Amino acid sequence: MEDIIEGGISSDDDFDSSDSSSDEEESDTSPQIMKSDVTMASPPSTPEPSPDVSASTSNLKRERQRSPITWEHQSPLSRVYRSPSPMRFGKRPRISSNSTSRSCKTSWADRVREAAAQRRPSRPFRKPYSHPRNGPLRNGPPRAPPLLKLFDISILPKSGEPKLFLPVPSLPCQEAEKTNDKYVLAMAQRAMHDVPISSKQLTANLLPVKFKPLLSIVRYTPNYYYWVSMRKETIASANLCTVAAFLDESLCWGQQYLKNDFIFSENGKDIILDTSSALLSQLVHKIKMLPFCHCLMQTTPQDHIVKQVCYLIASNNRILDAVRYLQTSVIKSPIVLLLAYAVCLPAAIICTKNETQLYSHCMRILKEYRPGDVMNILHESLTQHLNKCPSSTCAYTTRAIVGTKANTTGLFFLPTQ
């Protein structure tokens, strides 16, 4: 006991000193708490608890130990291999022969997303000499290699003998026509030969009387392919005067179809109507070559209609699109009216049941036709042009296209009023 009293709790002074020290600490902390209360927000709705000294000392931020591993960020722009360029759909990647990136080996194992776009290390793909199908030519046509052949030698003719004619398939055999009308038989006999066009005139009053006897030849003839081949041969090598005569015949025959309630269809065989599409394409080519069309368009500015209709028919034979385009404007030019007359019959033949609006528009054009209108339109236009145009080149070109004589082989009649 004595040792204990001597070592620690021997006297009362120690207790007094410890009490005094604790009182000093309490006296030091109490005014600090009051100061913190004073510096708080004005409405102390909930008093804050007194700060704990031991908690504040335990929440000190520790210093992070540095890791021995060094982290480095590598940008995708500084990688050693070359990423494959994005390819268009359906296009092969092209590898240049003088590429410098082939020396470095590429490891594609770590690149999972780019594994599908690997470049072949073999020979480069052969570049086509023609322009790509998708898109127009931007930088002009590609240059051919200097050692490319001009043409294949195997396509040259084997024999060097001069040829004075070309082989043409012969016409089928002709049979006797099944009709008893002498006037119609005489008309068919004249149609087989190239006779003057004045001998084939037929008045508009006589045609309805001879319609049914003539229908037995035009529609029910046993020589259908003979007549169609003869008419197409004449139309293919015809001048503008011959084309106008055939067009007058076709339009007047179509009017008789309309008056007798006949149906225009592709399945029916008709000598006159089945050559209307060839007649239309030939007329379009003649109009495109005529220089006097530009002179006629100065009074009635519908040159764009002529160009558009000629483009639709001459490029892809888009007859129905040409009729749709003609529906959008009023015809104010004789050349546009001539094209409308020529396109109405082929469009009426190929119109289906779903295109009733186009069919009715073609019938409206056909009803407005008068016998001999095509010849009269061209005659007035040419007369007006020759009296005003001083160009000699234009006059010579017009003479070559119009022609001086009409070929009437295959023509049955020329309608007149």
Curated annotation (Swiss-Prot):
GO molecular function: molecular adaptor activity; RNA binding; zinc ion binding
Keyword terms, alphabetized: Activator, Early protein, Host cytoplasm, Host nucleus, Metal-binding, RNA-binding, Transcription, Transcription regulation, Zinc, Zinc-finger
Signal peptide (residue range): none
This protein's GO CC annotations: host cell cytoplasm; host cell nucleus
Segments of skewed composition (Low complexity): 96-107, 132-141
Zinc finger map (CHC2-type): 295-394
Biased composition (Acidic residues): 1-28
Membrane as UniProt keyword: no
Subunit and partners: Homodimer. Homodimerization is required for transactivation. Interacts with host ALYREF and with mouse ALYREF2. Associates in a complex with RNA, and host export factors NXF1/TAP and ALYREF or ALYREF2; these interactions allow nuclear export of viral transcripts.
Domain notes: Binds viral intronless RNAs; the RNA binding site overlaps partially with the binding site for host ALYREF or ALYREF2.
Chain's role: Probably acts as a viral splicing factor that regulates viral RNA splicing. Functions as a multifunctional regulator of the expression of viral lytic genes. Early protein that promotes the accumulation and nuclear export of viral intronless RNA transcripts by interacting with mRNAs and cellular export proteins.
Family, as annotated: Belongs to the HHV-1 ICP27 protein family.
Extra information: ORF50 and ORF57 are the earliest genes expressed in the lytic cycle.
Record's protein name: mRNA export factor ICP27 homolog
